[in-house]
């Protein structure tokens, strides 16, 4: 009842992920929302079962804890790490500024740039989950299983991130749920 009174009950989720995982999800989500609002382009790859070592070797090693501030800072334009992809392994930022394969798919709109082609490309050759923030529009897109989902909401983004990063079914639970 105390949680209900404070409103925090409505913000809880129906899965079994840990507080650490929730903190990571929120750090990534806040960074992505911040960059989207300011049209700071970003490409973040979450390694799953398929190893991404070949692509990790093309980047600049970081081996850093994930934080909203670090995620945002890496993609600030005209800084040494902002071009290329950030690859996350588990709960660590493995590298930044890594090169990814570009998709040759004719299904990708010509209006989309290199970040989107790279996001689809890595999802065609691996099971990685990838987040793209468009510097042109500020839209947030994700790729997985060779598919691109464009212009998704914060809630959908968090749900997909949790599902693909931690395998959790991440849905907000309301009073009548």
Residue ranges and their predicted role:
Residues 1-177:
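Divalent-cation
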């Amino acid at each position: 009842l105390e949680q209900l009174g404070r409103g925090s009950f409505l913000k809880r989720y129906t899965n079994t992920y840990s507080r650490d995982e929730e903190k990571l999800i929120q750090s990534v989500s806040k960074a992505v929302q911040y960059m989207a609002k300011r049209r700071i382009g970003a490409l973040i790859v979450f390694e799953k079962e398929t190893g991404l070592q070949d692509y990790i070797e093309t980047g600049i090693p970081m081996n850093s804890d994930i934080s909203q501030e670090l995620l945002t800072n890496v993609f600030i334009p005209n800084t040494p790490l902002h071009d290329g992809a950030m690859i996350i392994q588990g709960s660590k930022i493995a590298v930044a500024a890594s090169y990814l394969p570009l998709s040759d798919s004719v299904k990708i709109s010509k209006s989309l740039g290199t970040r989107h082609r790279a996001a689809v490309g890595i999802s065609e050759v691996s099971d990685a989950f990838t987040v793209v923030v468009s510097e042109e529009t500020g839209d947030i897109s994700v790729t997985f299983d060779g598919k691109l989902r464009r212009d998704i909401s914060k809630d959908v983004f968090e749900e997909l991130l949790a599902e693909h990063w931690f395998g959790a079914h991440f849905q907000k639970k309301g009073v009548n749920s």
